[in-house]
């Protein structure tokens, strides 16, 4: 006995009736509550019927009064318990519960089918068990239906089960008043419900009330009629179950065999053998609701013009009519499963009319009466009907029934890309005229796979077996243009986000259970061998549905939102890497590393030092004015004078505004201004801003100026602009978000394996002394883990969703990959080799045939000869040289085959990575990641790590929110030093945005040469001037750490021989600025007179590919060097030209306004007709 977990629901294989028992208990509780209410009204008649009749007959007057009182009580409760409407509702309620039980059996049958695909032997083992349970359930349903109809009228059973004395009195009294009873029945219409309830009638009879004898007669008469109806209904239901049981057992046949069986059965109806009663071992048992609600195999053939073999003779057509009248007719009041809310989504028809099976001479009308299913949608039916319409318009009436059936099967198989393994469709051809209308119609329904197999005959050929048909459907699905575009979006979105994909597919619990338990290494290769290659080429219908769900999620824009600090103590990921959070925290606290974290987090997040905050007013006696006109009048200014407020060290901006006649308001908190420029967005009161007041920040600008806000919104470009953000933005994860934290852990593990593949490649290429089993295991495992991200996206979803095979790194695999036993540290290896080279016998083991190593060996030989002064003709030396040469040849032959095999494997893995991963070159050899605090600037709190444990030590326990970003391990170096670029830009309005790009940037260099092995040296990796100035040894000439754009462009031109910067780099910078701001335009609080002056940080790799690092709000405007001094003065003067001269000019004169170095590279124009935004690019 074991349990399974499919689609988030747990179910026991050996106990399929657990849900049924639970529903029966609920039904009994409901029935008990109803009977309790009825029993209160039945108490007095039950005492009369089941008690001592002599005592009640002697006290006739008291009984008559009690009967009158009870009669009035029954009249009041007649509507609640005894009206025909209430009985019908009660009956429907019981039938609804039974249909819900059937619905649960249907769901369980679907789960069994998924399990049987994984383990076919399990189907044979549980076949007899399912047969036994199915027959028991059918009998239980029959008994419930029969008993339920008797429980509708409980007084009948009470009268029949009463004392013998009372029953004798009733029979005698009714026999003496037979004529009177018949007359009263005719007067009352034969309906005892019209006057009085059966309970009060029984009481009146026993109490001796002669006027009520007619009701007692009606009770017995109607009870006999209802019993006959129940027996007839029971027989009808029994016939239905037998017919359904035989339908389930019937084997599926190919079309050719079915047509042959039809002809043979029609010619000799007596030769038809009875339907088998045993369940087949090849087809799973399905229930009644499952047969009629699943459009598959034989049930599907009823509605596609295809007749099963059992419905050909006249006798079988009578059975079919019984089946339709008992189960499929919604007009039948006993078929409540059609209107049952539990089966509303599962029912096949929406109307009460059944589809008619057309004759063979009218195949073009086979789709006319089919009602669309509420579960399967209706695309294929509308498509088929439209194709038949086109056939009729074109006069193509030569298509036979068999071709029409094959066309339906083709539409099913290709539209859903899944064909069941048990379908035995023969190889047939469908003639479809390739008109333009047909092609347009097919393209609209995304069924582009129905094409002509050849241009001469225009035919579509079906495969002879299910595997080929499924594979062809899968290939056609992959070749569709729309699906290809959606597939690329999914691949780009989930390329590094495995945790999010597992969460969407509902496999999060399996994912965590995989992390918590150390399982054997389970790779995709082993799964392929276990399941067989045919499963790799099949996509089930569930897989297609889940892929469509994934596509919808990708198409849904992610919203930027604030979130609290993530609690790492509850992460199962930390347990998978053997990271003890509490133990690490205690160690960190003992070393007093966390003593100053709170004070550091409270520092300012701006990139510039602010001037000391002045008082609210220089004149304390002056009253603060809230109206700008009154403030100007109070300060004796012209009403046309413009007023500005600047909070921060922007002296050049202040000077530029004063040159234009603007007056500064010294009160930072005053609402009287035309322009306000601050360092922090918190200094702006957006609620009280006037429409014409200009401010230099947008509300909620953290969507693109914060580190995790930028990373989150850039991912939305995949569906809005179809742009792969990972081509220009290094992958970045927010460690404060649980989903992204899990993505980072898995991505770190895969990147670690790929970095080891790089190092193994160089080691095998340069020569290796020996390859033992452990090293070979690690090399092969690293290649296997690194190549998992290259598996096709649809196959990955199929593995995860259907087989619970997760492409993540298991704890056992990570334990092997993360060990330092075979870590190829250059320093350790060089020391090891130098020590071994001292022994002449083992020289041949450590040298390859490379030219550099041969020269190095010759140098060592010469130096050894000079120091020892050996004779060149010494025979001992010649003998040792010959022996070493022979040993070297033997060793090369011994390891050449295995090392060459492993080297080819590494080359193949890295080649795939370079083709499919846009950030392949960023990974490098060390797997370095850079950790940044979210709201800090100027290089504060930024550190580099290549160890997962060290990253956790630095992050866990701090209140600061961190992001981790992939370090660019192949940066372009200037004089062997790392550098980055600062580029200024201005964005206005945001509805739509207007983006200005400053024509000149500058380069910031590090003061120490680049060395990826020295991760703790901030002067090697951080280019911020505020960081580099603390390096007193190298900061003597600070101008050497800056480079202008012209100098940098000239350096690249001299290096490459062409103008790389202006031809390749700068156009890419403009596009990245545009796309980064467009990604968050619906997240920013758009305002007409708001703007943002921002500074972009870019890096360039060794392939001259620029990468966006971050966007800074209120960038530093300090005169740190002579280069920045000149540029800062220019950019602030030109900023005034944009926000004052250009923005405040009239529409007709804006073209002639000088904007200095700022160029408008993007301007969105509103389209008033459809309220859409059109973008126009300007160079």
Swiss-Prot record:
One of its GO terms (cellular component) is cytoplasm. Keywords: ATP-binding, Cell projection, Cilium, Cytoplasm, Cytoskeleton, Ligase, Nucleotide-binding. Coiled coil: none annotated. GO terms for molecular function: ATP binding; protein-glycine ligase activity; protein-glycine ligase activity, elongating; protein-glycine ligase activity, initiating. Residues 790-1152 form the TTL domain. Residues 177-199, 614-625, 881-890 have a biased composition (Polar residues). GO terms for biological process: axoneme assembly; cilium assembly; protein polyglycylation. Residues 592-601 have a biased composition (Basic and acidic residues). Its main location: other. InterPro entries: TTL/TTLL_fam, TTLL_monoglycylase. Disruption phenotype: Cells lacking TTLL3A and TTLL3B show a strongly reduced level of monoglycylated tubulin and a moderately reduced level of polycylated tubulin. Cells lacking TTLL3A, TTLL3B, TTLL3C, TTLL3D, TTLL3E and TTLL3F display shortened axonemes that are resistant to paclitaxel, indicating that tubulin glycylation changes the lattice properties of axonemal microtubules. Axonemes are however normal at the ultrastructural level. Its EC number is 6.3.2.-. ATP binds at residues 965-968, 978, 980. Residues 177-208, 250-278, 592-625, 853-890 are annotated as: Disordered. It is found in: Cell projection, Cilium; Cytoplasm, Cytoskeleton, Cilium axoneme. Polyglycylase which modifies tubulin, generating side chains of glycine on the gamma-carboxyl groups of specific glutamate residues within the C-terminal tail of tubulin. Polyglycylates tubulin, with a preference for alpha-tubulin toward beta-tubulin. This is Tubulin glycylase 3B. It comes from Tetrahymena thermophila (strain SB210). The lineage of its organism: Eukaryota, Sar, Alveolata, Ciliophora, Intramacronucleata.
